[in-house]
UniProtKB/Swiss-Prot annotation:
Required for targeting of connexins to the plasma membrane. The lineage of its organism: Eukaryota, Metazoa, Chordata, Craniata, Vertebrata. The keyword Mitochondrion does not apply. It comes from Homo sapiens (Human). Pfam families: Consortin_C (PF15281), Consortin_N (PF22883). It is a single-pass membrane protein. This is Consortin.
Amino acid sequence: MDDSDTPTYYLQIEPQDGCHPGDSVERSVTCLPSASDENENQLDGDGHEHLTSSDSAMGKPQVSEQDSLNNNESCTLSCEVAAGENLQNTLCEASRDEQAFLGKDKKIPGKRSPRSKKGTAKKIPPGLFSGDIAPLMQEKVLSAVTYAVDDEEAAEVNANEQPEAPKLVLQSLFSLIRGEVEQLDSRALPLCLHQIAESYFQEEDYEKAMKFIQLERLYHEQLLANLSAIQEQWETKWKTVQPHTVTALRNSEKGFNGEDFERLTKICATHQDPLLSKHKIAAVEKSQERKCSTQLLVSEDPKEGGATTKESESKTCLGTESSKESQHTVEPLGSSPCCHQMDVQTDSPSLSVTAGKDHMEELLCSAEATLALHTQSSETAGSPSGPDSSEDACEDDSRLQLAQTEACQDVARIEGIAEDPKVFLSSKSKTEPLISPGCDRIPPALISEGKYSQAQRKELRLPLRDASEALPTDQLENNELNELQQPDLTDSDGKSPQAQADSDGSENVLCGNNQISDLGILLPEVCMAPEEKGDKDDQLNKETEDYLNSLLEGCLKDTEDSLSYEDNQDDDSDLLQDLSPEEASYSLQENLPSDESCLSLDDLAKRIEIAEVVPTEGLVSILKKRNDTVGDHPAQMQHKPSKRRVRFQEIDDSLDQDEVGGGSCILLVLLCIATVFLSVGGTALYCTFGDMESPVCTDFADNMDFYYTKLLQGVAELKHWIYLS
């Protein structure tokens, strides 16, 4: 089939951004198949296929990329892909007309150019939401917000774009609100109202924006009223509950403490919702996560991928549809930036294999699938769209077969090593590969014996492209299988497509640019057998038990010896009182065994105890008191409490509290009288020998005249009463 012929079953759709062939921005062509068996899933691997100026001048239409999924196999797989994108959120119907309608906007996640981020939201019928739930509606609202983000970016790129996408967003939000009203479930209603108000505000239709923001405010006011009613009901219930049940519930609660509640209170009191930018970010992140999960779902089925690649290879070798197959890129891994970091993580669970042949067969299938994908990507990138593409594809197919046979041999070798009981590995090895940023060498945690000592080490030397992709070598199967899979990823990511098409296929897959040196860096001390570890653990446990038993016996002996020494000390108490503390401790230490080599830590501690227990003058020993209770010294027992009684009686002989209070009152009155006399006398002295005409002295003279006349009158009346009596 000649490339110059224009296929009649492809329909070219012009983009709606107002661009023309003469503009600087390249035209993008979206092709829709009309046949029922054609693949409808358009692959957006690196944006739309752009027509260069020369191709557009010659009038050659290029077919956009397609993925390797067959739409006629199952409807659920296409639904999973559509749900992973989650930008249109349409339901999967059984009819072919509905699938053809959905196929216009359905795309496998991949890299997106800034031009391909324009919002192409479709109208969502209200009937589709009759069976959905509120969280799904919230996700759909967030998808509508994603369209708003894409519309803003598109407006920045192209200023001549007509404002059709915001209208589509508003229509989708209106359909959401209709579904909410029908279901009588309004949890997503305030979010819809806020997004509609934001859309009208951006369009400068402030009247409608104010109406919808007022509706949102009414919703939240009613929500607050309902919450306050619920709170009042709970408070009344709380007051009627008995106290013991409340404490039981409080003791059973162990999840949150005071700090957690303070943090939550601070967050609830300082949040700035509703804020559109925050919802935008959340929507974008959510859509990217769904893209990643969809890619993982697509890439987890290696057998179907292998089958489709084999079919495409046969078509390419026959040369019937070389122009179509040259455009195919069936490798979704590493296509989007957010999913590139998850490639190694998705390989590790699929390659975490226990010992068994079934898992080895799965490995073989996945290895074949990745080899096929790698070779096909080299075909698509390196081969031109012409008659030579079929020859190059056939050559690459032969290289692929050689690489697959070599991969089968390596897998068989790994099976032999895994089944050999002589090769053993530490179950809980704490060593990790020592990897430097610029080094591609790994010290394996493998100990082999016999025939696997040197020969198998040389066979197991496999390349590792990036040190950051090195996985833990806890088991032999994981180690070798990961090293088989990692060259495929590194070759598809790191090498140029032309170099992949020209180089040998088997060397590209199993031997990379970097080679690992001799596997001689082993740690036999750490990688020991589990049985030897168990024996050593038992021995350590026995030693610790013996040591603890000896400590307990030593402590009991020490207590007995201390009691015996206390008895001897009571007998010689008179002698010890005449000596100084140093001499007493020295004399007591002489009673201990003289052989220093036989002394243990317990004996030394016993010496310290005896030195501390030595009584001094004026102090009473606690141990002596304990021994006195037995009945050795009853006279001393009666004598000591008597001394204490005498001391308390001395305190009781002091002044009574009432007497002390009366004396304090008399003292206070005397102090007041003395203060009055001192003040009056001081003022009189100042006025007598100082300034007589000062205002203080004049006031003082008037007061003295007044009080003096009063005093004279009182004295006269007193004399009169005395005379009468």
